Amino acid sequence: MSLGLYIFHIFVVFPLLFYVAFFRGLVPLWVYHGLTVLGLVIIVYHMYKAVIRWKEKSPSLWVNIMHIIFVGPLLVYIGKNDYNTPKWAFEVLSLAAFAALGYNVYQLIIDVTKMRTIRPEEVYDKEASSSASVAKGKGSV
């Protein structure tokens, strides 16, 4: 997954899910309709991605399956029931929001630490070793 996708989940997905889970009955009706559409889009998109990852034998297939089985249906359920949604669904949504935040922050940290930066001492060490080998070559001629 890319850094952009992690950042999207941290700064867009988490706040949206937390907002709906926390404010429940104070959320405008159009937000519930949006959750229904979003849930359906998530299910369809992740079914498509799951097929691709299945063919590639990707170890990340589980992410798509979680979205198909858990995230999408939960959003559709809350969206369709709007103000009549039971309390447990909002609590599960809150858990999903914090799980998404935690997982994506963790993955972002892992990916950022894997990025390799060029340090000045690495550049100078390479230059010093290459100039030393050139000097040895010229001295023996």
Regions found by a protein language model. Give the residues of each.
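Short, highly charged, low-complexity non-transmembrane loops/tails of multi-pass membrane proteins
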Residues: R116-V134
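Hydrophobic core segments of alpha-helical transmembrane domains in multi-pass membrane proteins
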Residues: Y32-I42, F90-A100
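Membrane-helix boundary connector in multi-pass membrane proteins
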Residues: F22-L26, K57, L75-L93
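Canonical alpha-helical transmembrane segments
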Residues: V41-K55, V76
